[in-house]
A protein has these predicted regions:
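Conserved short alpha-helical segments that host acidic/polar catalytic motifs at enzyme active sites
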Residues: 19, 26-242, 248-309, 314, ...
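Phosphate/diphosphate-binding loops
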Residues: 366-369, 374-394, 435-442
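N-terminal amphipathic/basic-hydrophobic helices that include classical n-h-c signal peptides
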Residues: 1-32
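Flexible loop/turn segments at secondary-structure boundaries
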Residues: 45-47, 135, 201, 209-210, ...
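Short, glycine/charge-rich flexible loops or terminal/linker lids adjacent to PRPP-binding catalytic cores
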Residues: 327-375, 414-426
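Hydrophobic, well-ordered secondary-structure elements that form the walls
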Residues: 297, 325, 382, 404
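Secondary-structure transition/capping motifs at alpha-helix termini
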Residues: 302-308, 327-334, 368-372, 394-403
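PRPP-dependent phosphoribosyltransferase catalytic core
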Residues: 198-199, 234-240, 393-505
Length: 505
């Protein structure tokens, strides 16, 4: 087994899970948010394609990265590193010279250390997942009640989510049936890859909330969360898996194990915030969607008498929305502050809120000549707590801005995500929109009353909007309308998940 370098402490533990004994190398990490996965099945060595393919998912997490390959001796090698203080490439540069084979998978994981290596009645395999299981406690208890087994407890008392997925797979007699069992039993969202000694299983979330695409070149195939991750590696688009679709990939072919389902609910936030500008989901490019989104905002503003001197976006994801607004409105696009990109990652990644706020402030450097005495229309991808955007607004005022008009690129976030956990908020009351609703309505708010605050044509919504504006010190505030935002994708609205904005499943 390959040494783990400066990764988190590891202990190999023999034990049982589900109805079957197996051994698993376990990591003492907790947490279940976003991440990215990549796999390669090739007639030639996969090491470089795997290295760069996983690295192209670094925008989806800043905590841990992991690689696993099936080596020439038919055994699995793995390396996992903490990447919170240095980029993926610098941590894995030396490892990749020693990890060779024709099959490999890897991930960027924003807490949970992956891939896991497993030995069970199904044989040896490696697994990596993206998503969140909201009925984890129930499933764990069901498995414990059904058999004399155990789960390895991580620090903080959490059960490793991917270990639970392994337990569900091991309840069946084949890996393919085990993956189907996962899709049937979990609530939430899971997209995964399972690497055996014969090939790689890829399975998209049952409702397609997260993507999984396949690229092809002469030597073989790759599987990827992000469609842009394989472009520079010489792969061409082969197919995008549909919701719930399962495939088995070898260097020679892609075999469909389960056809896609009819119902799609892909996360709209992939376009608004998560996705890298070069990525495409369901054939819709992220950058283009953000241009469309900004254009819709501009058309709504044309009905009012707002005449800013310039349009600016909060880097990075707000920038393309602002370009779209500027192109549509004719108001000049400007960069009144610049993100210092060499060292600062996305600010929502640290677990400490004060640290996130500090990073959000430190990474933006003002351009005084573009701010002083200007009326600025500022677009951010969203408002979650509101803390960082308020501080950014105050920062603009302190730098001499005359007015700051704010246009978030999505509606007010009213519900915590049950499927991807894009925010580290522990309670819906962390969301500024919900705090304001509680301020007006008290703690016990019925769904009917809450629905009024989600409707931009109601007095309740207007009252909430004005209160948020005052609390965050904006000159004016106008959120994106849900229909306009969905229209920006060009997809049927029924294909898009809108739970965090209107609570609809």
């Amino acid at each position: 087994m390959k040494k783990q370098g400066d990764s988190d402490s590891i202990s190999g533990i023999e034990g049982g899970m589900g109805c079957y004994p197996f051994s698993i190398i376990h990591f003492n990490i907790a947490g279940l948010p976003m991440g990215g996965i990549f796999g390669v099945a090739s007639k030639s060595d996969v090491s470089l394609d795997l290295f760069f393919g996983v690295d192209y998912h670094s925008h989806l997490g800043t905590r841990r990265g992991g690689l696993a390959v099936l080596n020439e001796y038919g055994t699995f090698e793995r390396s996992i590193h903490n990447i919170s203080n240095s980029p993926f490439r610098t941590k894995f540069d030396s490892d990749i010279n020693d990890m060779h084979g024709h099959l490999g998978i890897g991930c960027i994981s924003d807490y949970e250390a992956q891939p896991l290596l497993v030995h069970s009645h199904l044989g040896s395999f490696a697994i990596t997942t993206v998503g969140i299981v909201t009925n984890k406690d129930e499933l764990v208890q069901d498995i414990l009640d059904a058999s004399k087994t155990h789960f390895l407890e991580m620090s903080g008392g959490e059960i490793n989510q991917t270990e639970l997925i392994v337990a569900l797979i091991n309840q069946k007699n084949t890996i393919a049936d085990g993956i189907k069992n996962v899709q049937e039993k979990i609530k939430g969202s899971i997209t995964l890859m399972v690497m055996t000694k014969d090939g790689i299983y890829g399975a998209r979330d049952k409702l397609g909330r997260t993507p999984l695409v396949i690229g092809q070149k002469e030597e073989g195939f790759c599987l990827s969360f992000e469609s842009h991750a394989y472009i520079n590696l010489g792969y061409k688009d082969y197919k995008e898996l549909g919701p719930g679709e399962i495939v088995f990939v070898t260097p020679e072919k892609v075999e469909q194990i389960q056809k896609p389902g009819d119902k799609m609910k892909i996360c709209t936030f992939l376009w608004i915030y998560y996705g890298y500008p070069t990525a495409c989901y369901e054939g819709v490019n992220v950058e283009q969607m953000r241009y469309n989104c900004g254009a819709y905002l501009a058309r709504r503003d044309a009905e009012n008498n707002i005449k800013p001197d310039c349009v600016a976006g909060v880097p990075d994801s707000g920038t393309a929305h602002a370009v779209g607004y500027a192109n549509e409105s004719g108001v000049p696009f400007s960069r009144p502050f610049i993100k210092y990109t060499p060292t600062w990652p996305r600010s929502f990644m640290p677990t400490n809120q004060n640290q996130r706020n500090l990073i959000a402030h430190m990474k933006l450097i003002p351009v005084q000549q573009l701010i002083k005495d200007k009326s600025i229309l500022l677009i951010d991808d969203s408002i979650v707590r509101g803390t960082q955007l308020r501080e950014t607004t105050d920062f603009l005022y302190e730098s001499g801005a005359k007015e700051v008009h704010v246009r978030p690129a999505c509606p007010p976030i009213m519900f915590g995500c049950k499927y991807l956990n894009f925010s580290r908020s522990k309670s819906e009351m962390d969301l500024i929109a919900r705090r304001v609703v509680r301020q007006f309505e008290g703690d016990d708010v019925s769904p009917e009353v809450l629905a009024k605050y989600c409707d931009p044509d109601t007095p309740e919504y207007a009252k909430m909007l004005e209160e948020i504006r005052k609390q965050l010190h904006f000159t004016t505030l106008r959120f994106h309308r849900l229909d306009d935002m969905l229209d920006s994708t060009g997809l049927d609205h029924c294909m898009l998940c809108t739970y965090c904005w209107n609570g609809q499943e």
